[in-house]
Design a protein with these regions (language model features):
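Conserved short histidine dyad/triad with adjacent acidic residue
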Residues: 44-61
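A short, N-terminal "cap"/entry segment at the start of jelly-roll beta-barrel domains
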Residues: 1-41, 55, 87, 145-152
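Short, surface-exposed charged micro-motifs
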Residues: 65, 86, 104
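Flexible, glycine-rich phosphate/dinucleotide-binding loops
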Residues: 74, 82, 122
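Short beta-strand His + acidic residue motifs that chelate non-heme Fe in jelly-roll/DSBH
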Residues: 55-57, 75-76, 95-97, 102-108, ...
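Glycine- and acidic-residue-biased ligand/ion/polar-headgroup-sensing regions
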Residues: 61-79
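Short acidic-glycine-tyrosine-enriched beta hairpin
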Residues: 79-100
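Double-stranded beta-helix
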Residues: 108-152
Length: 152
């Protein structure tokens, strides 16, 4: 049988419960989301021309996987011992974030990150702010991060 997939229209995808959601965030990032009826989905995030932190948060049900396509990110989290830590991820690297792990991401200028969100996320909003982690991560400027992670 010849491989000849049929294109699916946005209207047909919408009937299947698939939603498109495109936003520009306050930090200049552009996010292009594809979300299923169960709340799981994919997001392609384009960093702005200036590196910036996102907003610290956690999920009660969702697992997220961040994949660095280009550029680099700093991934911050509060671990199970309640310690704040930062990790540098470069092109081709990824991190998996489990439910209830408070996390944040600093995206380098013009970076591209893919995020996959899965789990039982169809019970309403599953995004909860983490002021404690914001206080920690947002105290680091891009210059500070360069000093901490010399190999950037």
């Amino acid at each position: 049988m010849k491989f000849c997939p049929k294109k699916i229209s946005i209207e047909e995808a919408t009937k299947d419960g698939i939603k498109l959601n495109f936003d520009q965030m306050n930090n200049g990032e552009k996010r292009y989301r594809l979300v299923g009826p169960d709340g799981s989905g994919y997001c392609r995030t384009l960093g702005s021309n200036k590196g910036a932190w996102q907003n610290s948060h956690y999920h009660k049900a969702a697992t997220e996987i961040y994949i660095v396509q280009s550029g680099w990110i700093i991934y911050g989290e509060i671990d199970h011992s309640k310690n704040c830590k930062l990790n540098y991820l470069k092109e081709g690297q990824s991190v998996t974030v489990l439910p209830f792990v408070h996390h944040n991401v600093f995206m380098s200028p013009n970076s591209v990150v893919h995020t996959v969100k899965c789990g039982e996320t169809d019970r309403g909003a599953d995004w909860f702010p983490s002021e404690e982690l914001d206080d920690y991560t947002k105290s680091f400027s891009e210059e500070d991060l360069f000093k901490l992670f010399v190999n950037i």
